[in-house]
Amino acid sequence: MALQAPEGLKRTLPRLADDLRRRGYSVIISGDPCYGACDLDLAARDRADILIHIGHTPVDNTERVIYEPWLVDGDLTVITRVIPHLREKKVGLVTTIQHIHLLQKAVRILRDAGIEPVIKGPFARTPCPGQVLGCSFDAAKTTKTAEIIFLGTGLFHPIGIQIATQARVLACDPITGRIEQPDADRLLRIRYGLIEKARSAQSYGIIVSSKTGQNRRALAEYLAHLSDKAQLIIMREVTPDQLLNLGFACYVNTACPRLAYDDQVRFPVPLLTPGEFEILCGVREFDQYEVDEIV
């Protein structure tokens, strides 16, 4: 069998491999970078009978892959402490797969305080109710609530939820205990500046990912038809050096949406989302801005 895990969990693989060998299995470890269930190492799988992917849930129906989520406990007093900050009696409740097992306890805490939590799902890319990904906010959008609690770490997901839903979002971190309200306006100002900078570009590279869960070829072909200065590029790993070597004045990303939002500072030229390129080409207005998701 082949073992794969994202960067933060890779050091668990040698110990797991040793345990499996003692049980009589032949094991190969995938050492390539991995950023999610959208990034399966099919080459490693094809050298084994099965690929065990640790840390995520499936986003598609790739054969001969077993998914084993990595659950992380946390302190749910953060939910108790957020209650006085709520303005609504009915709130959406979402989390990432790492904390999915904490949702029902959070539900009980909220209900005991007279708050009715709304949890939606499952969906195509998020098989657990209440689960969101950095590229999929269906569980948040379908709550149809004016206020949403995100239980998890970091602000990327809460900002995406705010843009996707227009709801008031409260981010509750069960690890640090912090409660934050994300500022999506700052991100939108940055993205607007990049769109304006890209208007003067004389060439646009439309990136198509070769990764199983990130390939949006049809979308990329549609975007390429919006400008006679656009060319399709197929890539597995999108890195600053690769983009610099290709030499386009601007790139449009149809691979992992987090590349444009999280990693723009690393890239030498604007890296736009599909919706941002539509704004640049006049297909939509900026007030119709949508966060990029893989659906």
Positions of PLM-derived features:
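The feature marks the mature, well-folded catalytic cores of soluble enzymes
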Residues: 2-180, 189-192
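Cofactor-cradling patches in redox/metallo enzymes
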Residues: 7-16, 25, 210-220, 230-249, ...
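Active-site regions of enzymes building and remodeling cell-envelope glycoconjugates
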Residues: 63-70, 115, 166-168, 230, ...
